[in-house]
Amino acid sequence: MKITYDKEAEALAIWFQGVKSAKTIDVTGDIFVDVDNQGRLAGIEVLHASKKANLQDLDNVSVQVPL
């Protein structure tokens, strides 16, 4: 799993390794989910992320977490 936050773009993303995105689904206009051809979750993107969670102490972040 890879988690990134871009403070300037106000975008938070979570990507699951081994799952290739085939389609992006607009959930709320600011939240998008990416799925593969079989409907498995490939990633989640949150725009305007600081309006949805307290991210004031975060700067640009990139974290990889093995599953």
Model-derived features: positions:
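Structured beta-strand/loop patches that form or line metal/cofactor-binding pockets in enzymes
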Residues: 2-7, 12-26
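Proteins with a high burden of low-complexity, intrinsically disordered sequence enriched in S/T/G/P/A and R
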Residues: 3-6, 10, 32, 40, ...
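A general secondary-structure signal for short beta-strands and their flanking turns/coil
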Residues: 9, 28, 58-60
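C-terminal structural segments of small proteins and small subunits
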Residues: 38-67
